[in-house]
């Protein structure tokens, strides 16, 4: 910084100290200017908080948001274009219902109904994904631009005005000790900054209909989401009512106990051998797992490192490129093409 710059910073600091500590009064700006400044301040706070809350509205789970942020950052670093989507709660519940509905089979009324509801929830998750994309492009991104460009520029003008106001007031208090030319230049710069700040605030506030339009687009997107979701649920309700009606017309079966098959020793009065297999002692199915084909060294936080030949327990497939798993008590993510699946994850 030049000597003149250091001198100016000293003037500002000295004037600010006088106002805060000694109670010296600085130049007052007009009421209209102060009202605009207040509205700009409220607007800046509103935009910042709305951006945060809008993201929470679309993606309410902070843990998933953090995980997605990390995964998408890793994907970008590795040159992968496709981003991982947020796991919608409707889709997670739908997957669960589809899984157990298919396991119960087509001869189960409950199983068939679970499949119906699961498929409907998966459709709702797709509609929610569309809402996410739509709201981000038409509401969140424009608000972010407003914050990063227009409001940031106004803030710059206001800070510059305050700096020049302090410089002017410092020199004004020292009339006779400071050359009149310096005071005149300080007045000109102060008035120039005031006009710039005033014009930028005025133009912004006069055009706030743009923000109203963005709100209208947001409401339209939310309305479209709820309209499509309502249609899906109404169709699902009709399906379930039909299943209830059909199930009520099926004749009820009576329970008929089946006789126990007796062995030849049982027929002679000898009980079953104590060495016979006790029900329920079957070995449980193996956990989903995979074997490392190559060594994988984690480069980012949250990745799981392993050596060639390590057996890793699979817990989740994040996308077509990444698994989530556990090894020696540690959990993390690793690339699919580094492993060979031994026992696959359930569908």
UniProtKB/Swiss-Prot annotation:
Alphabetized SUPFAM superfamilies for the sequence: BAR/IMD domain-like (SSF103657), SH3-domain (SSF50044)
Interaction with ARC: annotated span: 218-254
Coiled-coil intervals, chain numbering: 180-201
SMART domains: BAR (SM00721), SH3 (SM00326)
A Pfam family that the UniProt record links to this protein: BAR
Keyword Cell inner membrane among UniProt keywords: no
Entry domain remark: An N-terminal amphipathic helix, the BAR domain and a second amphipathic helix inserted into helix 1 of the BAR domain (N-BAR domain) induce membrane curvature and bind curved membranes.
Family to which the UniProt record says this protein belongs: Belongs to the endophilin family.
Protein name: Endophilin-A3
Taxonomic path: Eukaryota, Metazoa, Chordata, Craniata, Vertebrata
